[in-house]
């Protein structure tokens, strides 16, 4: 079916804003940016907020799986940015019911609670944080766009729950006057990152990064946090009747596809780490990690060094076009990868040193006899 084109010139003010996951990496950066732009913001998270007090900021601590708490969170709100999620990168038939239910309760049930509460409260706009992995099914994707179908091959619960939740959010567009859209980031990085490079640093400090996985020509894209936030705000502003964004999904990234190891190399070298020289087969590593994951869930083995999805990102092309976001939202990355790296390299070096000192202290404590 042909999509009826909206008018990209139609935009709106955001009004009073709710940010879920406001204590997290993306959410906290989004809250800060919105406050800097003069918006009134309510930050909602189950974790305590570390944001400094601000006259335009209200902090609500609570659980998104509680419908009553969601009702309180959306009261008086005009625009919702939903960034809260559990990131579980293992999945498949071998996972336990408890592991699966935890992800679905937050990522799907929590999204449903929040959106329905917003509809009842008269919220006008809902921007959902999805993932580019919703279309990744183990194939090479070079410059893919939003016409790609959802994957039905799930290596991880994060992707599985994001597919279900994104479909739900977009299907609710226009219901009770609320307009919805979904943003599909790639790997999110920048000051405050506690996921992408932290996981890499953990592997380095444990001595696990001895080889490079996959071909050097395989590329992925990333989403610098302030480029992503720029995309969020543009999308919300375009959630207007007859506008371009209602009911749509958008890839938002830095538009600079790069091999993951080449992307990480300047960071690790700045941390004083030697760069591996040897390369090994990506599919072989994925096969080993998939089997290891089954042993983890069925027999209690330690978790695999890499999740199957993480391995695929190392040896398959998985990067996406931002042409639709450019056309519909006027999106262009605010920062190049080099500009962003210059800005946040001191943060990453500091994080690595902190983690190294913590690991050394733990090792020392473990060797001290009681």
From Swiss-Prot:
Regulation of this protein's activity per its record: Inhibited by EDTA, zinc, silver, copper, and activated by magnesium and calcium. A competitive inhibition is observed with NAD at concentrations higher than 5.6 mM, and with trilostane (3,17-dihydroxy-4,5-epoxyandrost-2-ene-2-carbonitrile).
Reactions accelerated catalytically: a 3beta-hydroxy-Delta(5)-steroid + NAD(+) = a 3-oxo-Delta(5)-steroid + NADH + H(+); cholesterol + NAD(+) = cholest-5-en-3-one + NADH + H(+); pregnenolone + NAD(+) = pregn-5-ene-3,20-dione + NADH + H(+); 3beta-hydroxyandrost-5-en-17-one + NAD(+) = androst-5-ene-3,17-dione + NADH + H(+)
Active site per UniProt: 158
Gene disruption: observed consequences: Disruption reduces the cholesterol oxidation activity at least 90-fold.
pH curve summary: Optimum pH is between 8.5-9.5. No catalytic activity is detected below pH 7.5.
Subcellular localization(s) per the UniProt record: Cytoplasm
Highest taxon of source: Bacteria
Keywords: Cytoplasm, Isomerase, Lipid degradation, Lipid metabolism, Multifunctional enzyme, NAD, Oxidoreductase, Steroid metabolism
Positions that bind NAD(+): 162
Entry's Gene Ontology molecular function annotations: 3-beta-hydroxy-Delta5-steroid dehydrogenase (NAD+) activity; cholesterol dehydrogenase (NAD+) activity; NAD+ binding; oxidoreductase activity, acting on the CH-OH group of donors, NAD or NADP as acceptor; steroid Delta-isomerase activity; testosterone dehydrogenase [NAD(P)+] activity
Pathway this chain belongs to: Lipid metabolism; steroid biosynthesis
E.C. code: 1.1.1.145, 5.3.3.1
Any one cellular-component term (Gene Ontology): plasma membrane
Location, primary (coarse class): cytoplasm
GO biological process, one term: steroid metabolic process
InterPro entries: 3Beta_OHSteriod_DH/Estase, Lipid_A_modif_metabolic_enz, NAD(P)-bd_dom_sf
Known partners and oligomeric status: Monomer.
Family per record: Belongs to the 3-beta-HSD family.
Known function: 3-beta-HSD is a bifunctional enzyme, that catalyzes the oxidation and isomerization of cholesterol, pregnenolone, and dehydroepiandrosterone (DHEA) into cholest-4-en-3-one, progesterone, and androsterone, respectively.
Protein name: 3 beta-hydroxysteroid dehydrogenase/Delta 5-->4-isomerase
Organism classification: Bacteria, Bacillati, Actinomycetota, Actinomycetes, Mycobacteriales
């Amino acid at each position: 079916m042909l999509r009826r084109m909206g008018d990209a010139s139609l935009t709106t003010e955001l009004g009073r804003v709710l940010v879920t996951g406001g204590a997290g990496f993306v959410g906290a950066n989004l809250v800060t940016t919105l406050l800097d732009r003069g918006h009134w913001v309510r930050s909602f998270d189950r974790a305590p907020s570390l944001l400094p007090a601000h006259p335009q900021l209200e902090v609500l601590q609570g659980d998104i799986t509680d419908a009553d708490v969601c009702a309180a969170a959306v009261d008086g709100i005009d625009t919702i940015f939903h960034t809260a999620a559990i990131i579980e990168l293992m999945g498949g038939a071998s996972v336990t019911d408890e592991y699966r239910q935890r992800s679905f309760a937050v990522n799907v049930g929590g999204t449903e609670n929040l959106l329905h509460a917003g509809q009842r409260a008269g919220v006008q706009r809902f921007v959902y944080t999805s993932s580019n992995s919703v279309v990744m099914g183990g194939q090479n994707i070079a410059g893919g766009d939003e016409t790609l179908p959802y994957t039905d091959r799930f290596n991880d619960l994060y992707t599985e729950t994001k597919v279900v939740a994104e479909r739900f959010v977009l299907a609710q567009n226009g219901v009770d006057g609320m307009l919805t859209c979904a943003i599909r980031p790639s790997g999110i990085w920048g000051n405050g990152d506690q996921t992408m490079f932290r996981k890499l640093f953990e592997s380095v400090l444990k001595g696990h990064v001895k080889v490079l996985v996959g071909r050097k020509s395989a590329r992925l894209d990333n989403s610098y946090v302030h480029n992503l936030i720029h995309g969020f705000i543009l999308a919300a502003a375009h959630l207007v009747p007859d506008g371009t964004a209602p009911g749509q999904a958008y890839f938002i990234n830095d538009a600079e596809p790069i091999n993951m190891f080449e992307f990480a190399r300047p960071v690790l070298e700045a941390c004083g780490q030697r760069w591996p020289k040897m390369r090994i087969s990506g599919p072989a590593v994925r096969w080993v990690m998939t089997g290891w994951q089954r042993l983890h869930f069925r027999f209690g083995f330690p978790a695999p060094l890499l999740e199957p999805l993480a391995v695929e990102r190392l040896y398959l092309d998985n990067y996406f076009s931002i042409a639709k976001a450019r056309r519909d939202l006027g999106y262009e990355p605010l920062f190049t990868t080099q500009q962003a790296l210059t800005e946040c390299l001191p943060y990453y070096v500091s994080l690595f040193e902190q983690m190294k000192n913590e690991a050394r202290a733990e090792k020392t404590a473990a060797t001290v006899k009681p």
